[in-house]
Amino acid sequence: IANPTSNQTYTLTATDNSSGCTATDQVVVTVNITPPVAEAGNNFTIDCNQNSTGAGIGMSAVNGVTYSWSPTTGLTNGSISNPNAAPASTQTYTLTATNSLNGCVATDNVTVTVNTTAPTANAGTGFTKNCTSNTSGSQIGMATASGVNYAWSPSTGLNSTTVSNPTANPSVTTTYTLTATNQSNGCTASSLVVVNVDTQAPLANAGPDVEI
């Protein structure tokens, strides 16, 4: 059995024991066990700030090599060397490269992390400002969450537009929009609240002056 680790030429010599005559023959064993190169690419993150539509993974194709990816979830093509990856959740992809000439294979992995969790936005419960209740306005919004930025629009009648729970004291009925932004991934959520203003005084008419 011949099992060399590199190309070898073997020579067989046969000798006739009675005459001493010899004959030779050669056989060449070619060793072709070179694996292909598999490069799955660099890990990356999909969030609301970057790579929102995914990104390319893998490598440039090499002649004589076939490629397959597993899993194929979120890939534009699971049988090319460099598909676009846009999974809905975090995935680790395995690239298998196969040398078509010798069947040798190589593998490599790449992880696509998906971080698209939106924050919670709750603009609070609307209220009515009139001459007897909420005369100085009232608080709207929600408790502050760590790692979240807040922005209110419009700013009219608010004591702050960048806190989660400002006091609203508009002079006319106003619909406020709260936008919450996750600092870690740029994802946003929004919510509305209406503050009704009913401060129109009634008409008072005592009539003309009279002389008694």
Regions found by a protein language model. Give the residues of each.
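Solvent-exposed segments in extracellular or luminal domains encompassing
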Residues: I1-Y10, S79-Y93, T162-Y176
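Proline-enriched interdomain boundary motifs that mark the N-terminal boundary
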Residues: T34-N42, T117-T125, Q200-P208
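Interdomain boundary/hinge segments at the C-termini of tandem beta-sandwich modules
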Residues: V27-I33, V110-T116, V193-T199
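A short beta-strand segment in extracellular, disulfide-stabilized domains
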Residues: Q50-V62, S133-A145
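Short, solvent-exposed loop/linker segments at the N-terminal edge
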Residues: F44-T53, F127-S136, V210-I212
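Solvent-exposed loop segments of extracellular immunoglobulin-like
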Residues: A61-P71, A145-P154
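Short, exposed coil/turn segments at beta-strand boundaries within extracellular/luminal domains
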Residues: S18-T24, L101-T107, S184-S190
